[in-house]
Amino acid sequence: MAGVNNRVKVTNDIELKDRLVAINRVTKVTKGGRTFSFSAIVVVGNEEGIIGWGLGKAGEVTAAIAKGVESAKKNLVKVPVLKGTVPHEQSAKFGGAEVFIKPASHGTGVVAGGAMRAVLESVGITDVLAKSKGSSNPHNLVKATIEALSEMRDARMIAQNRGISVEKVFRG
């Protein structure tokens, strides 16, 4: 949904845990030889509905991860999490990657692969069914997953936007 503001400002009272999604060694060839550097995709979350992602590039792996964490802390968004799952089905596309996220019953676990799993676990979702289609590029998968999560709305948010009670959302 365009125009919806669910961004979160980073403060010291939010305790964020970081997860490394992917690391890539990049080689620049010059006439003097090869120069190696590293890029790292990092996801940070508080496991209570706040998530962010970042990309760090540096000459050393640890420096790239640290830059990625700092970048992720600047891109935080709030996501509705209901009883350990998502409120409704949602799909999103970024580049060639398309993701489908569906709520699951308690005890199912996180049924998702690779980059999607890191994002879903960092946001605090414990039961979900997720599928990726198209590109398996971790950059695009992370962005598409966060896009799908940030488009989700729970009943309270819908009622607030419409100016009605939560009961009226379900009864019509």
UniProtKB/Swiss-Prot annotation:
One of its GO terms (biological process) is translation. It comes from the Bacteria. InterPro entries: Ribosomal_Su5_D2-typ_SF (IPR020568), Ribosomal_uS5 (IPR000851), Ribosomal_uS5_bac-type (IPR005712), Ribosomal_uS5_C (IPR005324), Ribosomal_uS5_N (IPR013810), Ribosomal_uS5_N_CS (IPR018192), Ribsml_uS5_D2-typ_fold_subgr (IPR014721). Keywords: Ribonucleoprotein, Ribosomal protein, RNA-binding, rRNA-binding. One of its GO terms (cellular component) is cytosolic small ribosomal subunit. The keyword Nucleotidyltransferase does not apply. Residues 16-79 form the S5 DRBM domain. Belongs to the universal ribosomal protein uS5 family. Part of the 30S ribosomal subunit. Contacts proteins S4 and S8. The N-terminal domain interacts with the head of the 30S subunit; the C-terminal domain interacts with the body and contacts protein S4. The interaction surface between S4 and S5 is involved in control of translational fidelity. This is Small ribosomal subunit protein uS5. The gene is rpsE.
